[in-house]
C-alpha cells in the first residue's frame, strides 16, 4: 500500500498548481505603500461610484428604465441606488413627457436636490416634446427649458443598453470635473434653448356648418339660379313618420 504524502508535500503541490504566481511579498518601502493623488480625483472617484438617481418617469420611457432594476441588466453594479427623496439624490433622470402642469413640480424637485447634481433627459418626448408637441398645447418642448441638462439620451424609447451608455458617459464627466472650476462651467440661465412660445391657431373645423343659422346664411348668399345641396333639406324638411 503506497504511503500518503506528507502535509508539506501537499502544500507544495497546491502552491505549484493552484497559485503559480505565488504570494506577493510585503515591502516596507514608502513608495510602494502610498498612492499619490489629488483631492479632485479622490472626490470625483467617490461621487461617480455612488450616483443616487431620482426617477422622474411620466410616460413609456420609464418602462424601459424599470427593466434595469431587474437581475438581467444589474443596475446596481454602477453604484446607482434609486431614491425617493430629492434631498438624498444627486442625479435626476427625466423619462417621459413633461406638461405645463407638471413643470413647477419638476423644477421644485430639481431645486431641492443638493449640489453637485446632474440631469439626464431620457427619450424624445423629454428632449424635444416628441410626437405630443405637434398638436398638444400643454407639452413642454424640451425639459432644458425648465432645468439644466447634462446629458441627452435620444430614443423612443431608449433601450436599457443605451441607458447604460449614458450612465458611463456621465461617470466620465463626473471624473473629469474640478472643484475649483465647477462653478465656472455651470449654466447661468435656466432656459437653455430658444424661447418657449406658443402661437394660437384658429381651428380649421369649427362646426359652424352644422348650425341652422349658418345654412340659412349660405342660402341667402347663394347667387340666383344656383341651388345648394342643402336647399331641399332646409326648405322642405322630411315629413314626420306617423305610426299606425
Curated annotation (Swiss-Prot):
CC cofactor note: Binds 1 [4Fe-4S] cluster.
EC id: 7.1.1.-
Annotated [4Fe-4S] cluster binding sites: 60-61, 125, 156
Main location class: membrane
GO molecular function: 4 iron, 4 sulfur cluster binding; iron ion binding; NADH dehydrogenase (ubiquinone) activity; quinone binding
Localization annotation: Cellular thylakoid membrane
Gene Ontology cellular-component terms listed: plasma membrane-derived thylakoid membrane; respiratory chain complex I
Keyword entries, A-Z: 4Fe-4S, Iron, Iron-sulfur, Membrane, Metal-binding, NAD, NADP, Plastoquinone, Quinone, Thylakoid, Translocase, Transport
Topology in the lipid bilayer: Peripheral membrane protein
Catalytic reaction list: a plastoquinone + NADH + (n+1) H(+)(in) = a plastoquinol + NAD(+) + n H(+)(out); a plastoquinone + NADPH + (n+1) H(+)(in) = a plastoquinol + NADP(+) + n H(+)(out)
Claim: NADP is one of the keywords in the record: yes
EC top class, as a word: translocase
Any Pfam family the entry gives: Oxidored_q6
UniProt GO BP: aerobic respiration; electron transport coupled proton transport; photosynthesis, light reaction
Keyword rRNA processing (UniProt): no
Cofactor dependency: [4Fe-4S] cluster
Family as reported in the entry's similarity comment: Belongs to the complex I 20 kDa subunit family.
Quaternary structure and interacting proteins, as annotated: NDH-1 can be composed of about 15 different subunits; different subcomplexes with different compositions have been identified which probably have different functions.
Function: NDH-1 shuttles electrons from an unknown electron donor, via FMN and iron-sulfur (Fe-S) centers, to quinones in the respiratory and/or the photosynthetic chain. The immediate electron acceptor for the enzyme in this species is believed to be plastoquinone. Couples the redox reaction to proton translocation, and thus conserves the redox energy in a proton gradient. Cyanobacterial NDH-1 also plays a role in inorganic carbon-concentration.
Protein name: NAD(P)H-quinone oxidoreductase subunit K
Gene source species: Synechococcus sp. (strain CC9902)
Gene encoding the protein: ndhK
Amino acid at each position: 500500500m503506497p504511503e500518503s504524502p506528507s502535509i508539506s508535500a501537499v502544500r507544495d503541490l497546491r502552491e505549484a498548481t493552484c497559485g503559480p504566481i505565488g504570494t506577493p511579498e510585503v515591502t516596507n518601502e514608502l513608495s510602494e505603500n502610498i498612492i499619490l493623488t489629488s483631492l479632485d480625483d479622490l472626490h470625483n472617484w467617490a461621487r461617480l461610484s455612488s450616483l443616487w438617481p431620482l426617477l422622474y418617469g411620466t410616460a413609456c420611457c420609464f418602462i424601459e428604465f424599470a427593466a434595469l432594476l431587474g437581475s438581467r441588466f444589474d443596475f446596481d453594479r454602477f453604484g446607482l441606488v434609486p431614491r425617493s427623496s430629492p434631498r438624498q439624490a444627486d442625479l435626476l433622470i427625466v423619462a417621459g413627457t413633461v406638461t405645463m402642469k407638471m413643470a413647477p413640480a419638476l423644477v421644485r424637485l430639481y431645486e431641492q436636490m443638493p449640489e453637485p447634481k446632474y440631469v439626464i433627459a431620457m427619450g424624445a418626448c423629454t428632449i424635444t416634446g416628441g410626437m405630443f408637441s405637434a398638436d398638444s398645447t400643454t407639452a413642454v418642448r424640451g425639459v432644458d427649458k425648465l432645468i439644466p441638462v447634462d446629458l441627452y439620451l435620444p430614443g423612443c424609447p431608449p433601450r436599457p443598453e443605451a441607458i447604460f451608455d449614458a450612465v458611463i458617459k456621465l461617470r466620465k464627466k463626473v471624473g473629469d470635473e474640478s472643484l475649483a472650476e465647477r462653478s465656472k462651467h455651470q449654466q447661468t440661465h435656466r432656459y437653455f434653448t430658444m424661447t418657449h412660445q406658443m402661437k394660437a391657431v384658429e381651428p380649421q373645423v369649427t362646426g359652424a356648418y352644422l348650425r341652422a343659422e349658418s345654412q340659412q346664411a349660405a342660402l341667402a348668399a347663394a347667387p340666383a339660379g344656383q341651388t345648394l345641396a342643402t336647399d331641399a333639406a332646409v326648405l322642405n324638411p322630411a315629413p314626420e313618420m306617423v305610426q299606425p
